[in-house]
């Protein structure tokens, strides 16, 4: 894949926010560490404006870590929220940070998934 990491992070963030619109107004700084070939690339994602920069993100409330190849493959295959959840459960990706933000995001995502399930059941 020829796209740079900043573009891929933007694509992934927009996909998650499109799938879980309740997260769109959240004001949050996320640090993203992509590990690969002996180095780590660090990025800063500022929400809600989705500003992605190559930066240490010292003010991040949440930090995401994963292998660069894994992240590229997830974005390339249009990963959905359920795919990301599996990645976190199986240890391919790791999230750390302020517990209140982590719990809030998990609750919002779970509610959205429940809404999607009930919507499908009605049809």
Model-derived segments and their meaning:
Residues 1-123:
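Feature captures hydrophobic
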């Amino acid at each position: 894949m020829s796209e740079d990491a900043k573009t891929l992070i933007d694509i992934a963030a927009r996909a998650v926010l499109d799938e879980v619109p309740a997260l769109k107004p959240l004001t949050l700084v996320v640090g993203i560490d992509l590990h690969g070939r002996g180095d780590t690339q660090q990025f800063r994602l500022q929400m809600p404006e989705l500003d992605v920069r190559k930066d240490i993100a010292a003010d991040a409330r949440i930090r995401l870590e994963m292998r660069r190849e894994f992240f590229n493959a997830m974005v390339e295959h249009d990963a959905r929220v359920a795919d990301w959840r599996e990645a976190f459960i199986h240890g391919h990706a790791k999230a750390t940070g302020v517990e209140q933000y982590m719990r809030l995001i998990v609750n919002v995502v779970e509610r959205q998934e429940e809404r999607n399930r009930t919507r499908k059941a009605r049809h």
